[in-house]
Each structure stands twice: as C-alpha cells, then as structure tokens.
Amino acid sequence: MVFEPWMVAPCGMNCGSCIGYMRAKDPCPGCRIDSDPKPSYCKSCIIINCDLLRETVSGFCHECPKYPCARLKSLDKRYRLRYHTSFFENLAVIRENGMDHFLAFETGRRTCPQCGATLSVHRPFCLKCGVNL
C-alpha cells in the first residue's frame, strides 16, 4: 500500500495502518474523510472535532496552543503501551522532517518483511501471511 498524506490523522495516527481502514467489510475511510462507514467512536472523536484544530495551518495537533492536550496524552499512552507506537513521535517526525519523510518511515515499518503486505498497527502479526512480528 502507498500511504498518502490524507491518511494521517491530526493526532499523528496513520489511518492506512488502522485495522478499521484495512478491513474488507465496511472499511473506515479514515479520520480526515467525512463519510460512512465510519465507526461511532471515530465520528465522536474529540481530536478530529476539536475547534482549536481547525485554527491550525497544517491540521495537526502539534500546532495547537494546548498541545499536548489531555486527550492526546491519553491516546498516546494507550497506543505506546498496547501497540508500541507513539503519536507524539509521529507528529515530531512530521514537524521536523516533513510528511514525505514520515510516509516513507511508515512504509518501512508497516510493511511485512515476509510477504510485503501492509501491517496493521493494531495487530502483532501480518494479516495476510500470519507471520508474527
């Protein structure tokens, strides 16, 4: 899969590696796309619906005057513990090196070394070939 800039949520999540985006039946279109089918928890996401986010130039949380907010801290902690990925690190890469660098970084770490399929951030194995990571 080729990751695109629109796939990166304001919090730094790469929607292209989300299990909701990757599923075959009723895949989520991604955080930045306002259409169904989108899970209810995504529709009501505090971050994507944040008024302060709309005031940023880039559309990313790292430009917000309240960065990092309590919601982003909580989300980052949960993803670091459960999925070994940090939204703060993702946003830092975007801010310091640009979107192209981040997308190349994501492609490298989200590609199965066994079969080349896209890896989900939410699973410790490849959804295509089953190799444990």
Q: For each predicted feature, which ranges?
A:
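Disulfide-stabilized extracellular ectodomain repeats and their linkers
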Residues: 12-15, 25-28, 42, 47, ...
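Short Cys/His-rich "knuckle" micro-motifs
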Residues: 26-27, 38-42, 72-73, 120-125
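Mid-chain, well-packed structural core segment of small domains
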Residues: 51-89
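Short, flexible, mixed-charge glycine/proline-rich loop motifs
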Residues: 2-9, 18-22, 33-39, 52-55, ...
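Ferredoxin-type iron-sulfur electron-transfer modules and their immediate structural context
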Residues: 2-9, 13-30, 77-78, 82-93
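Cys/His-coordinated zinc-binding microdomains
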Residues: 19, 32, 46-49, 54, ...
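Short cysteine-rich clusters marking metal-coordination/redox-active sites
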Residues: 28, 61, 112-115, 126-129
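Extended, acidic-biased charged interface segments
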Residues: 68-71, 86-95, 99-111
